[in-house]
């Protein structure tokens, strides 16, 4: 089985090349793609419009293998979280969030994360490896057909998952070569048929890869901002030491020249006494002044030993009002799935930490540190 080719690893061009390598005509690739991604077929015997000789050939050479489900949890609010096996002792989490007019899937791109944002439990487990294209798109494949079964939907019914956010475990732009083909499949009309506006990639700010994505596959972009100045962001998002705010904002402006939406979504985790003052909000307005944007304020979801607390509702309201008064669309994310640890910042999975010390050092250590905000000082506890 280890020598089998996993067809989930192929986007349209890859599947075409594979079919041609088998001596098959090009139209077979589209047939095969529809069976896999639109019908959810995992058995070549089901693919009745393929020649029997091709089905037999595929059965001995290829497989359709999504990550195996280890656990499956349903929240009281309808959120569903899967823990899936990606081998070598690693597992990642995939979360489905139902809403009245859409169904959003939060997909992981790495086993662990080397960026090690201070407020995120994923980074505390270290980094093991990048996921393959098949492991990334396999989360969508698995979730779509699991949800269809749960809701009693057939192959001709509307898709359950209407939006995908690359906001699970990992930094997508540090796994570029696997993430982009996976997103191509999400957009492909012979696969999942999502629009570029309905696929959102969230990044902590890997500037060179943001520029590359703008040329290769400009989907909707969300940027994990979380701080109003470089001194604070260096602590909360250590990648900022490599790509500081001025460079990041310039990259956002360049990206908007090609983006499917005319704004960048900035994500901002609200941390009590750290980044949530009215002064921080005013400083933030100066940082994003030249970037058309909206803000998504995220109440912090505590996890053991984080040393951080969630801002209270009144403080979040005051912070958001500063942004709203400046004409910036600002939303406060409703916490979903927190009873099954599926809320933002809680995805940790099970990771065998193989992070090289040099890799960790690149983004800085987690230590007790005095953080100077816009007009206040706060000492963050050790994580």
Curated annotation (Swiss-Prot):
Its cofactor is [4Fe-4S] cluster. It is found in: Cytoplasm. The active site is at 93 (proton acceptor), 344 (s-methylcysteine intermediate). Its main location: cytoplasm. GO terms for molecular function: 4 iron, 4 sulfur cluster binding; metal ion binding; rRNA (adenine(2503)-C2-)-methyltransferase activity; rRNA binding; tRNA (adenine(37)-C2)-methyltransferase activity; tRNA binding. NCBIfam families: rRNA_mod_RlmN (TIGR00048). Specifically methylates position 2 of adenine 2503 in 23S rRNA and position 2 of adenine 37 in tRNAs. m2A2503 modification seems to play a crucial role in the proofreading step occurring at the peptidyl transferase center and thus would serve to optimize ribosomal fidelity. Reaction proceeds by a ping-pong mechanism involving intermediate methylation of a conserved cysteine residue. This is Dual-specificity RNA methyltransferase RlmN. It comes from Ralstonia nicotianae (strain ATCC BAA-1114 / GMI1000) (Ralstonia solanacearum).
């Amino acid at each position: 089985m280890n020598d089998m080719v996993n067809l989930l690893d192929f986007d349209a061009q890859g599947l075409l090349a594979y079919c041609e390598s088998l001596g098959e005509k090009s139209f077979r690739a589209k047939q095969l793609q529809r069976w896999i991604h639109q019908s959810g077929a995992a058995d070549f015997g089901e693919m009745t419009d393929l020649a029997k000789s091709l089905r037999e050939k595929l059965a001995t050479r290829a497989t359709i293998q999504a990550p195996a489900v280890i656990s499956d949890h349903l929240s009281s609010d309808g959120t569903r979280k899967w823990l899936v096996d990606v081998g070598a002792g690693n597992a990642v989490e995939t979360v489905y969030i139902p809403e009245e007019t859409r169904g959003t899937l939060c997909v992981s791109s790495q086993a662990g994360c080397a960026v090690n944002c201070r407020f995120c439990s994923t980074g505390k487990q270290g980094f093991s490896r990048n996921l393959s294209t098949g492991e990334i798109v396999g989360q969508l494949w698995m979730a779509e057909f699991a949800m269809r079964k749960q809701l009693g939907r057939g192959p001709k019914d509307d898709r359950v998952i209407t939006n995908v956010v690359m906001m699970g475990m990992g930094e997508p732009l540090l796994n570029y070569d696997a993430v982009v083909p996976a997103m191509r499949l999400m957009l492909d009309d012979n696969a999942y048929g999502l629009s570029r506006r309905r696929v959102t990639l969230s990044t902590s700010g890997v500037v060179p890869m943001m520029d590359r994505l703008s040329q290769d596959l400009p989907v909707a972009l969300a940027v994990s901002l979380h701080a109003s100045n470089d001194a604070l962001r260096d602590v909360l998002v250590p990648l900022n030491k490599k790509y500081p705010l001025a460079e990041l904002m310039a990259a956002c402006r360049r990206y908007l020249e090609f983006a499917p939406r005319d704004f960048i979504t900035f994500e901002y985790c609200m941390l009590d006494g750290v980044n949530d003052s009215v002064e921080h909000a005013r400083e933030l307005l100066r940082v994003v002044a030249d970037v058309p944007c909206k803000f998504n304020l995220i109440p912090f979801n505590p996890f053991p030993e984080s040393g951080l607390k969630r801002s209270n509702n009144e403080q979040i309201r005051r912070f958001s009002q500063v942004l709203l008064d400046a004409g910036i669309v600002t939303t406060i994310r409703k916490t979903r799935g927190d009873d099954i640890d599926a809320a933002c910042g809680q995805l940790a999975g099970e990771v065998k930490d193989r992070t090289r010390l040099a890799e960790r050092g690149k983004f800085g250590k987690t230590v007790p540190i005095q953080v100077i905000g816009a007009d206040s000082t706060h000492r963050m506890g050790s994580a």
